[in-house]
Amino acid sequence: MQSLMRAVQVNNPGGPEALELVELPMPVCKPGEVRVRAEAIGAGGPDVLIRNGTYKWMPPLPAIPGNEMAGTVEALGPGVTTLQVGQRVLVSSRELPQRGGCYAEFICVPEDAPFVLPDSIAFQDAVSLGNVQLAQAMLLAGNGGLPVRSILVPGAAGGVATMLVQLAAHHGMTVIGTASTPEKKAHALAHGASAIVDGDPAGLPDRVFALTEGRGVDLAFDHIGAELLIACIRSLAPLGTAISYNIAGGPPARDVFMELRSLLSKSLAVRTFSIHTFDADRQQRRALMEKAIGLMSQGAVRAPPTRVFPMTEVQEVHRMLDAGASLGKLVLAPR
């Protein structure tokens, strides 16, 4: 029986060089746990935050990053009744007592944590399902039950943004996106965007109004903050909402409340969003993921193109994450 496994560990947070490939004892199932053998491991933004030690939900050091793993059930602990050896599953750290843990060849988790995967979803595609879950939640929370005809998705070729584009198109919405390169523009259009415009915040509202007969969009999804959040607000239709789901560029220099007041006749709103809203609502959180699995299995949404790297190249993968230039999903192969 194998006694050791490979994993990626962070002892001293920092840049990509902080990621160390180590050998650790093979995890042993406790009662009520299953051991999952990894086939594909997703690499994304939360992993970078664990690596550099700034994640709000930081696991204790030494920490194993990784928030999504797809693989097969390899062993059962005493008392397990709901899963079987050989079943294909997705492990999301949103379902675990602490975040991280997926940059490893094996992981032991409570039997009620994994999601069973249909054969129609490849392992390397399954690690993008968390972005479908998040995008669904944002669309549902978006406009307070008001009808949504159109949305604005800056950076429409990004991981979460690609899923927003597809879900909105699936529901018959007009999707205006922005993209910074011809390749990203083609990617967004291929995944359901109705139109792609220049993303420069200075002229973004005018470009949106030109495509919507002067009306604007019902929802605008901002992942940057700074001047882009202001541009999203200014691009809204009456009763529209700008949703801030990240703040990579820092807060805007302008007073957001005064910006809303200056557009008072349109009755606009700004909503922040985090998937951690559902940390205490297991039933809804899991329902969103089960819905995401169904949508991908049915072909209503597609996983983005994947780039697969051996676990030995994890530092290079994180350099690519830091640069933000990669198109599609970065995936680690444990073997």
Where are these predicted regions, by residue range?
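C-terminal hydrophobic helical "lid"/dimerization subdomain
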Residues: 2-3, 281-335
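Glycine-rich beta-strand-centered segment in the early N-terminal region that forms part
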Residues: 25-43, 54-95
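NAD(P)H dinucleotide-binding glycine-rich loop of Rossmann-like/cofactor-binding domains
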Residues: 82, 92-155
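Short glycine-centered segments of the SAM/dcSAM-binding site in methyltransferase folds
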Residues: 88, 150, 174, 240-241, ...
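N-terminal Rossmann-like NAD(P) cofactor-binding module of classical short-chain dehydrogenase/reductase
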Residues: 90, 220-221
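Mid-domain Rossmann-like dinucleotide-binding core that forms the NAD(H)/NADP(H) cofactor-binding site
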Residues: 126-201
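Short amphipathic alpha-helix with an adjacent loop that forms part of the alpha/beta core around
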Residues: 203-214
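Glycine-rich phosphate-binding loop and adjacent beta-alpha segment
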Residues: 227-300, 334-335
